């Protein structure tokens, strides 16, 4: 099993400013791939891409617009540079390592990895026939595609819930989108979660979902989020109420309940 902190959070990868091709070559000899290079010129950007290193293009106001960079930081002034968290995440994405999303008192939420698959398969197997649970993890190829396509494009999705103390995978939770049959609400952020049966009843879902709501407001700057559940799912309905989500009228043919939360955390 993947250690709960493997590849996330504490990489301490430096961000190194370079302005010329020659300077880049000197820095590369020292740091190699174990750095993120902060570049504001096209020539060194092309060199670092050829070398296979991670880089962020610093786009100054009224400066050169670069379409070749994987990551662009739009500077508001000369002091506006990427912070350590952004630098670590650029490097982790470049190295195909999972992002640490957030921590709580007992949990870590991180991007999923292939080593999580056996746990996911067991969790979804337990829920076959449950109308509230969409079977989202049937095999290796499905999870591999999700990791490769979802996280880089959206920077959110379903994440893995891990016990901070032991590294045990408790379930999945995160943010996706309401489906097309929700009319004008289609595509709106949806809070989703699935906890393994043996781990239920200990507050894991509430703790994880509270952290996700806070992350959605603070980091993703979302204004509202929805949660769907069937009328028969008493536990999900109670959780929605505990999270402060308000029930709104169902608009689908499936007769499910829809809850909405306004994300108004103070900054």
Stretch-by-stretch model annotation:
Residues 63-64, 232, 255:
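Positions that flank functional sites
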Residues 45-46, 118, 237-238:
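Alpha-helical elements of the RecA-like P-loop NTPase motor core of helicases
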Residues 201-218, 234-242:
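Conserved acetyl-CoA-binding loop-helix of GNAT-fold acetyltransferases
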Residues 59, 231, 251:
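Nucleotide-sugar donor-binding loop of glycosyltransferases
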Residues 40-42, 227-237:
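Conserved beta-strand-loop-alpha-helix junction that forms the acyl-donor binding cleft
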Residues 51-55, 241-251:
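Conserved acetyl-CoA-binding loop of GNAT-fold acetyltransferases
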Residues 4, 32, 73-198, 214-215, ...:
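GNAT-family acyltransferases
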Residues 1-102:
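Asp-based, Mg2+/Mn2+-dependent phosphohydrolase catalytic module
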């Amino acid at each position: 099993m993947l250690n709960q902190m493997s590849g996330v959070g504490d990489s301490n990868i430096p961000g190194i400013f370079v302005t010329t091709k020659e300077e880049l070559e000197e820095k590369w000899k020292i740091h190699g791939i174990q750095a993120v290079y902060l570049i504001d010129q096209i020539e060194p950007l092309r060199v670092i891409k050829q070398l296979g290193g991670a880089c962020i293009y610093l786009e100054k106001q009224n400066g050169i617009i670069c379409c070749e960079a994987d990551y662009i930081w739009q500077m508001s002034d000369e002091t506006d540079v990427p912070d350590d968290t952004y630098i670590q995440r650029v490097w982790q994405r470049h190295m195909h390592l999972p992002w640490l999303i957030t921590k709580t008192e007992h949990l870590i939420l991180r991007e999923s990895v292939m080593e999580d698959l056996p746990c996911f398969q067991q969790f979804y197997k337990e829920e076959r026939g449950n109308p509230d649970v969409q079977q989202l993890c049937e095999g290796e190829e499905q999870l591999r595609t999700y990791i490769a396509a979802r996280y880089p494009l959206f920077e959110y999705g379903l994440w893995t819930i891990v016990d901070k103390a032991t590294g045990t995978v408790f379930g999945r939770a995160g943010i996706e989108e309401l489906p097309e049959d929700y009319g004008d609400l289609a595509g709106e952020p949806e809070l989703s979660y699935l906890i393994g049966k043996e781990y239920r009843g200990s507050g894991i879902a509430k703790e994880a979902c509270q952290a996700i709501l806070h992350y959605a407001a603070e980091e993703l700057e979302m204004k509202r989020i929805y949660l769907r559940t069937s009328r028969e799912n008493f536990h999900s309905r109670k959780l929605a109420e505990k999270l402060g989500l308000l029930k709104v009228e169902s608009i689908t043919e499936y007769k499910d309940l829809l809850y909405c939360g306004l994300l108004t955390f103070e900054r």
